């Protein structure tokens, strides 16, 4: 198989094929994006704009021609293989790749690989990374996938390993429940229960516009030959509880029905039916109309402009009713199954199905699209995109300036080690519904519903960037959490990267709490308002084995905790909360003035006061804290002046592992 068009012209053009794959000096540096200061916060480039800095990613020929080839332009690209012409070659190769049809992505992906390497030095910021991802999505035999993956990983900050494991996330959630009873964390990964789910596969949910009815597909019914039959079911919500699911009798037949969606007015039902005599392929898309007597009928096949000789399913209708997204494995697709769409004309006729393109579709499978009508966001399930947590994951992509943005994984609060399909959101963008399976039983799908986490929110497109360094400027390891103070939307916590950086995509114009925790520094907390893309850089305050704070100066002869002590004592408390395996020793010391017996009592009273503050205010177990007063028996300097006495009047904290 030729990675480029097979040419029957001069031998020099055949050499071009090898040259495009092999030549080129490895380069790794990406151009830095420029920022500017505003109100003490660095404002960065708009996320969606940066994704679309190059119109190469629109690929206008995808639905026009199956394969693009221009021998003269290939010769011109070959002629530019000389020192100092990298910029010209980049421009010519980019213009050529831009014209690709669907078949080019299976036969000529090596051109994109070459363009990606050139783009690292010649292209706009971010373009090379998107090109590397494009190669990974469409790679075929003949390319070194490990080398491509290595290049992509070197410049891609978004990795699965950045996310904190789910079990640790739950520990953070339990901690938040204790410290903030007014804003309890929202639950995630909640099974819809026995009123909806069965012991068989349940999937394909769609929610009515009033959010009080759910339609879904189930294999709970058996045919006469004991094979499972796919049928549509529905349930209605009453007082926040779902009724027992009922079969959709007016639509179900002896054939398989599933993957339904309703029009905005609730009068048209689009669904898939398989093995039907009037079908054009294995599974076809149909529409049923709600009649005046409130029964469903007039079932019609959507016809050859939408259906193919293959498998067509998973319809999703826009609220305007003029665009239908669906999945298909028809011939001429990018992969095993692709996302397609059809647009209805003014006469009500559905147009010829069009492929959603190579940014959405991959050489693997893309299924179950859902289009968010308000924010122009396409959600879908895929096993072909570079970042994934399981087999099939849910992704989202924005329609922006005539093209789709690079799909974004909706994160570990949605995606697990199994598979997730059929993502949909209610009318208020509050709750999500989808089908998911466990890693242990990947085929047994159940329906789940819970509040939409931040990574899956349609408006979570504004980037928070930050870093954590020690006083010497070296990166520090830790975990970063972001709390939505306005709406309580859950945000998946992340590890700080090796270079000390972190980032989150958040909803703009909201108040958030940033929390940074680690083993070697005091917890950092900062409330901020998201006003455009923001950067927060912090310096960690390292924890020594023995700590003394200047703020812990008691009034003469007294042991009362003063307000100015709270900040430093809170740091100690938070560190103990973050590290339940640690033990604290509080040592109280005085100077040598006065009687030793009185000094001993005073130092003990001060140590006890601090312990009581930590136990009372932060619920830290008393067994984890020892409070000992030493009086003046352990001076750190010989007392000659009043300054020396002040140094000896101190409270020290020693942190150690519990035995």
Predicted regions: what they are:
Residues 382-390, 579, 587-659:
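Periplasmic OmpA-like peptidoglycan-binding domain that tethers envelope proteins to the cell wall
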């Amino acid at each position: 198989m030729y990675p480029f068009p097979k040419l029957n012209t001069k031998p020099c053009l055949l050499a071009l094929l090898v040259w495009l794959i092999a030549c080129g000096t490895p380069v790794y540096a990406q151009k830095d994006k420029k920022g500017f200061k505003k109100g003490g916060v660095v404002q960065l480039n708009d996320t969606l704009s940066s994704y679309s800095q190059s119109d190469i990613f629109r690929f206008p020929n995808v639905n026009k021609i199956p394969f693009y080839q221009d021998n003269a332009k290939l010769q011109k690209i070959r002629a530019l293989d000389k020192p100092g012409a990298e910029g010209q070659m980049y421009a010519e190769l980019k213009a050529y790749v831009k014209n690709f049809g669907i078949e080019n992505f299976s036969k000529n992906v090596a051109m994109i690989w070459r363009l990606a390497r050139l783009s690292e030095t010649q292209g706009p910021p971010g373009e090379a990374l998107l090109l590397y991802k494009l190669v990974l999505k469409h790679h075929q035999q003949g390319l070194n996938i490990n080398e491509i993956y290595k290049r992509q990983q070197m410049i891609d900050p978004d990795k699965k390993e950045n996310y904190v494991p789910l079990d640790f996330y739950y520990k953070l959630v339990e901690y938040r429940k204790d410290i903030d009873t007014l804003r309890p964390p929202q639950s995630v990964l909640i099974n819809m229960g026995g009123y909806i789910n069965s012991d068989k596969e349940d999937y394909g949910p769609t929610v009515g516009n009033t959010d009080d009815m759910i339609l879904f597909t189930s294999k709970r019914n058996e045919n006469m030959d004991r094979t499972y039959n796919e049928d549509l079911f529905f349930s209605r919500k009453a007082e926040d509880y779902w009724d027992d699911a009922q079969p959709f009798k007016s639509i179900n037949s002896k054939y398989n029905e599933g993957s339904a969606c309703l029009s905005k007015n609730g009068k048209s039902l689009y669904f898939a039916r398989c093995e039907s005599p009037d079908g054009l392929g294995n599974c076809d898309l149909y529409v049923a109309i709600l009649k005046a007597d409130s029964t469903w009928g007039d079932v019609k096949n959507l016809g050859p402009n939408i259906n193919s000789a293959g498998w067509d399913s998973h319809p999703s209708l826009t609220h305007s009713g003029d665009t239908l997204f669906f999945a298909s494995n028809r011939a001429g697709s990018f992969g095993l199954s692709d996302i397609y769409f059809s647009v209805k004309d003014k006469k009500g006729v559905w147009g010829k199905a069009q492929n959603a393109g190579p940014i959405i579709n991959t050489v693997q499978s893309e299924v179950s699209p859902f289009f968010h009508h308000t924010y122009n966001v396409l959600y879908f399930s895929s096993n072909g995109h570079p970042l994934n947590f399981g087999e099939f994951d849910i992704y989202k992509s924005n329609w922006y300036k005539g093209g789709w943005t690079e799909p974004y994984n909706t994160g570990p609060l949605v995606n697990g080690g199994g598979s997730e399909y059929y993502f949909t959101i209610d009318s208020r963008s509050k709750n999500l519904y989808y089908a998911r399976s466990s890693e242990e039983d990947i085929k047994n799908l159940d329906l789940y519903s819970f509040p939409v986490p931040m990574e899956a929110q349609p408006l979570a497109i504004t980037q928070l960037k930050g870093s954590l360094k020690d006083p010497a400027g070296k990166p520090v390891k830790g975990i970063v959490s972001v709390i939505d103070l306005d709406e309580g939307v859950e945000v998946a916590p992340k590890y700080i990267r090796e270079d000390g950086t972190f980032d989150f995509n958040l909803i703009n114009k909201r108040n958030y709490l940033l929390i940074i925790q680690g083993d070697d520094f005091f917890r950092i907390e900062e409330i901020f308002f998201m006003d455009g893309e923001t950067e927060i850089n912090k310096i960690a305050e390292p924890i020594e084995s023995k700590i003394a704070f200047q703020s812990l100066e008691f009034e003469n002869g007294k042991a009362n905790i003063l307000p100015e002590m709270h900040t430093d004592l809170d740091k100690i408390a938070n560190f103990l909360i973050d590290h339940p395996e640690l033990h604290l020793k509080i040592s109280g010391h005085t100077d040598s003035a006065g009687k030793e017996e009185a000094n001993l009592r005073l130092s003990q009273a001060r140590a006890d006061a601090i312990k009581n503050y930590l136990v009372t205010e932060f619920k830290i177990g008393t067994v984890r804290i020892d409070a000992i007063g030493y009086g003046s028996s352990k001076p750190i300097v010989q007392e000659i002046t009043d300054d020396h006495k002040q140094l000896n009047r101190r409270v020290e904290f020693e942190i150690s592992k519990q035995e």
